[in-house]
């Protein structure tokens, strides 16, 4: 970024100014936006002189640096941006719209409605959202480092312990759904059965794990989890909208389980990706670019590890669906050892206390 005289602007506090050397030995200086998305503030509260007339001029150049390294992961990706000059304040994080003792779920929906999805990474899945779930939920979607949805639960320590750090999936019927950041490791079921209500993992989650949460359990809603799953065709090789319909929507099985703790759905994982991925299928044997393998860099729910979901394959008595370490959706025997992340819904009565939602400043509740 340079001013009208060609002088480099180096005092923007929201970005890191760097000097690097490209593959040909050329030195390039500027602000690093490699992992940036959403709204980036360049100048804030800048006074504009109206009289006498004055023209402020800046030149903004975006450079893709060609290093001597494998950059094949960038193939097929696109870049776009807009320059905004605004008078009104645009809210970016929860603390911009929420104060102590507001309902957490209301804070999230208010932020979404007062801002734009490209800024907050919160998408309202109403009938107007292309390829959305159409369940009126509000879901966080996009690259992990661009989403401010961290929440600290069950701890008042200034630095949230790993065991207490969660991320918000979204708001569903006034309840806030969260998923633990740090995964565990176990079988879906020790006896290799894919009936969730009697599975060893469900027993652990709603027994030992739930007890370990202490008083936080009072803030967790008892939920009717839809656990009938679906077929290979309508879960593993379908687009998110179809997956949602067969997992929890109008075409879902009547098989349910009432409990406080569960796991993510396949559709939770898939709708965690940026909207550009919502036309992909979970798995494509002939073309990985058409499957969720291609969405890894734009899906905050992707861990880089193989992990279980709560959904089973309905045409089998022992296989359940999971996410592979390559980002695609697959299924396997319930006795298989994989990672899993506990997930649950917070009651609507839960109040926001503080926090912007970043990993270092997670949301705190009452």
Predicted regions located by residue number:
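Intrinsically disordered, low-complexity coil segments
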Residues: 23-25, 46-54, 155-164
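Surface-exposed intrinsically disordered loops and tails
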Residues: 19-41, 129-133
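Collagenous Gly-X-Y triple-helix signature in extracellular proteins
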Residues: 93-366
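C-terminal, structured domain-capping segment
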Residues: 40-94
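Short edge-strand/loop segments of extracellular domains
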Residues: 2-3, 84-88, 183-185
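Short loop/turn segments at connectors of secondary-structure elements within structured domains
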Residues: 8-11, 54, 75, 162
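Surface-exposed interaction patch
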Residues: 1-31
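Non-catalytic surface loops within mature trypsin-like serine protease
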Residues: 3, 66, 87, 346-348
């Amino acid at each position: 970024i340079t001013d009208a005289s060609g002088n480099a602007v180096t005092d923007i506090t929201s970005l890191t100014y760097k000097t690097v050397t490209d593959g040909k030995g050329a030195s390039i200086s500027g602000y690093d936006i490699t992992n940036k998305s959403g709204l980036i503030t360049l100048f804030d509260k800048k006074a504009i002189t109206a009289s006498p007339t004055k023209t402020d001029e800046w030149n903004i150049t975006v450079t893709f640096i060609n290093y001597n390294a494998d950059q094949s992961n960038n193939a097929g990706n696109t870049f776009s941006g807009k320059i905004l000059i605004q008078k009104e304040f645009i809210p970016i994080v929860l603390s911009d719209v929420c104060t102590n003792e507001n309902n957490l779920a209301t804070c999230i929906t208010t932020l979404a409605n007062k801002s734009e999805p490209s800024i907050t990474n919160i998408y309202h899945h109403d009938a107007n959202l292309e390829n959305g779930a159409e369940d009126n939920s509000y879901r966080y979607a996009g690259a992990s480092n661009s989403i401010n949805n961290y929440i600290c639960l069950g701890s008042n320590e200034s630095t949230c312990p790993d065991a207490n750090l969660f991320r918000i999936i979204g708001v569903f019927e006034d309840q806030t759904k969260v998923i633990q950041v740090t995964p565990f490791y176990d079988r879906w079921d020790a006896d290799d059965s894919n009936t969730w209500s009697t599975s060893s993992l469900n027993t652990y989650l709603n027994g030992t794990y739930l007890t370990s949460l202490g008083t936080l359990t009072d803030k967790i809603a008892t939920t009717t989890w839809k656990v009938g799953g679906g077929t290979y065709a309508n879960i593993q090789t379908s687009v998110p909208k179809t997956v949602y319909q067969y997992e929890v929507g109008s075409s879902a099985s009547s098989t349910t389980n009432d409990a406080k703790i569960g796991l993510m759905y396949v559709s939770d994982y898939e709708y965690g990706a940026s909207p550009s991925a919502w036309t992909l299928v979970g798995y494509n044997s002939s073309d990985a670019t058409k499957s969720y393998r291609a969405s890894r860099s734009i899906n905050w729910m992707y861990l880089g590890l193989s992990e279980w979901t709560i959904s089973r394959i309905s045409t089998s008595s022992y296989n359940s669906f999971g996410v592979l370490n390559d980002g695609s959706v697959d299924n396997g025997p319930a006795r298989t050892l994989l990672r899993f992340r506990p997930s649950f819904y917070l009651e609507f009565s839960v109040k926001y206390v503080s926090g912007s939602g970043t990993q270092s400043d997670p949301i705190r509740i009452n």
